[in-house]
Curated annotation (Swiss-Prot):
Protein name in the entry: Uncharacterized protein C1703.09
Organism listed in the record: Schizosaccharomyces pombe (strain 972 / ATCC 24843) (Fission yeast)
Keyword Mitochondrion: yes
Compartments where found: Mitochondrion
Main location group: mitochondrion
């Protein structure tokens, strides 16, 4: 082995005495994989330049292990309560939107049912009016027919009464006089209520 080649397993060459960590700590760091061992093995040096640095400089290992805080980076801590509140708020908003849609549908259905109810009410009123007019026409027709029949019967009765009265008057018998008196009494009663002016016995 050449003199200008430094042995890798020599602890005094790998870590000077002025270092802040020991060789054992160095190998523990290397074994943990935090730093590479080849970065701290010195290169070829001559015998004339081989000196020991007794200054108080920080070793390369210590300088790499020293982490300066980055002032520009800001760590934002998220509160779990805030996350839960956001999730609950989103769920509530979703439920509110669904409820609003359902309310709009119910309102549309109510308006449609109300319109149908009004149409059914109008149709029912028209049917009732038609039935009333039909019944009224039938009733008036029945009354007119009854009045017409009664009028015809009264006319026939008066005609027959006149014939019977004339026969009884010309027979000049007791039964005929009785019939004439009955007819006269009936006539007076009818005259009082109906006041017919076309019949007169006087």
């Amino acid at each position: 082995m050449q003199d200008n080649q430094v042995l890798a397993n020599t602890a005094s060459m790998i870590m000077p005495k002025s270092s802040f960590i020991t060789t054992k700590q160095l190998w523990e760091i290397v074994l943990q994989g935090k730093v590479e061992a080849t970065e701290f093995i010195p290169a070829d040096v001559s015998d004339s330049t081989q000196t020991v640095d007794r200054s108080n400089k920080i070793s390369p290992i210590t300088s790499q292990l020293t982490i300066e805080p980055n002032k520009s980076q800001t760590i934002v801590k998220k509160n779990p309560d805030n996350l839960i509140f956001v999730a609950v708020n989103q769920n509530v908003q979703l439920q509110l939107s669904i409820l609003k849609q359902q309310q709009n549908r119910v309102a549309a259905m109510e308006s449609a049912l109300q319109r149908i109810h009004l149409e059914i009410t109008a149709m029912s009123e028209q049917l009732i009016l038609q039935k009333y007019q039909k019944n009224r026409f039938f009733f008036m027709s029945s009354i007119n027919a009854l009045i017409r029949i009664s009028r015809n019967c009264i006319k026939l009765l008066f005609k027959n009464s006149l014939v019977l009265l004339a026969a009884c008057y010309f027979m000049n018998t007791t039964p005929s006089r009785l019939v004439i008196n009955l007819i006269r009494s009936g006539y007076l009663i009818l005259k009082r209520f109906a006041n017919p002016s076309y019949i007169s016995f006087y």
